[in-house]
Amino acid sequence: MKASPHRPTKALIHLGAIRQNIQQMGAHIPQGTLKLAVVKANAYGHGAVAVAKAIQDDVDGFCVSNIDEAIELRQAGLSKPILILGVSEIEAVALAKEYDFTLTVAGLEWIQALLDKEVDLTGLTVHLKIDSGMGRIGFREASEVEQAQDLLQQHGVCVEGIFTHFATADEESDDYFNAQLERFKTILASMKEVPELVHASNSATTLWHVETIFNAVRMGDAMYGLNPSGAVLDLPYDLIPALTLESALVHVKTVPAGACMGYGATYQADSEQVIATVPIGYADGWTRDMQNFSVLVDGQACPIVGRVSMDQITIRLPKPYPLGTKVTLIGSNGDKEITATQVATYRVTINYEVVCLLSDRIPREYY
């Protein structure tokens, strides 16, 4: 999907805020800890290349989801280490060696498939993924980890790192977190040779479990100024939200009592009202369940009336405003603010999803 720069809807990305968040987090973790910036999913909707270029001097490497995201960074001139967190296809090994990527190895079957196809593994760098309780990918038994490490090293692979991912680091109870941590430590203790890099800390672990950090952290949601727990846990220190979503009024009218708005005529004015149209809709990631949520105009909360359409929403204004008046969907307007977490709470989801769903049709502007 191409960006639509000829309409007022845009996402403003404060790159300085992201850098400040990295520095803030860095000040609260053990000195010498490597900082890996997670820029997968287009940097959580913020723009992977622009963000990576802005922060490359503040971090020690990058994490992405798949090899295509990694190639995008390399082709944009980013030279720092890139770890691909997901399982890669067998055909990706040659690309990983060509572009100097680090692959994740999560199972013996994957290694055996490479050996069966006689893929040249010499010079490949990998991290071993441990499934300590997340349940997605990774080795679950110490014996499998030992076998994998031996096989890889026998075929010229550099096993540089080992890592896991916590499922509940952003929740109030530590019970499951501690159980995962112990499983991971048990596997580490069983290894004849522990890889150089050991990392288990995502944003939530970095914020609320700093005492469990090994020698690297993966900075994701928090790097963009978002609270990984939503509204469950208070941040231990201030972070600056980096993304503002705004648009403008493109049509304003006064309608009589009884006038209906949107598909299904689900909203009917109970009096004479001022209704405005804003060019954003579910094709932009502003989903249909946002009906009745309020956006900000002139520092005032204005409810979305009628269903969210593919490309447009209608809002109720307290009075007529000129065409072009700014509408804030995420961010500050006057003395009021809408956060991604507030949007997520309304949708019964998480702030990660809110920013990741913002489509490419919305131009990103950086400052």
UniProtKB/Swiss-Prot annotation:
Pathway, per record: Amino-acid biosynthesis; D-alanine biosynthesis; D-alanine from L-alanine: step 1/1
Keyword entries, A-Z: Isomerase, Pyridoxal phosphate
SMART domains: Ala_racemase_C (SM01005)
GO MF term set: alanine racemase activity; pyridoxal phosphate binding
One GO cellular component term: cytosol
Signal peptide positions on this chain: none
A Pfam family the protein falls into: Ala_racemase_C
Gene Ontology process terms (BP): D-alanine biosynthetic process; peptidoglycan biosynthetic process
Keyword Isomerase applies: yes
Reactions catalysed, as given in the entry: L-alanine = D-alanine
InterPro entries tied to this protein: Ala_racemase, Ala_racemase/Decarboxylase_C, Ala_racemase_C, Ala_racemase_N, Ala_racemase_pyridoxalP-BS, PLP-binding_barrel
Binding site for substrate: 136, 310
Active site positions, chain numbering: 40 (proton acceptor), 263 (proton acceptor)
EC numbers, comma separated: 5.1.1.1
PANTHER family in UniProt: ALANINE RACEMASE (PTHR30511), ALANINE RACEMASE, CATABOLIC-RELATED (PTHR30511:SF0)
Protein family membership: Belongs to the alanine racemase family.
Alphabetical list of NCBIfam families matching this protein: alr
Function: Catalyzes the interconversion of L-alanine and D-alanine. May also act on other amino acids.
Name listed for the protein in its UniProt record: Alanine racemase
Source organism (scientific name): Streptococcus pneumoniae serotype 19F (strain G54)
Source lineage: Bacteria, Bacillati, Bacillota, Bacilli, Lactobacillales
This protein's encoding gene: alr
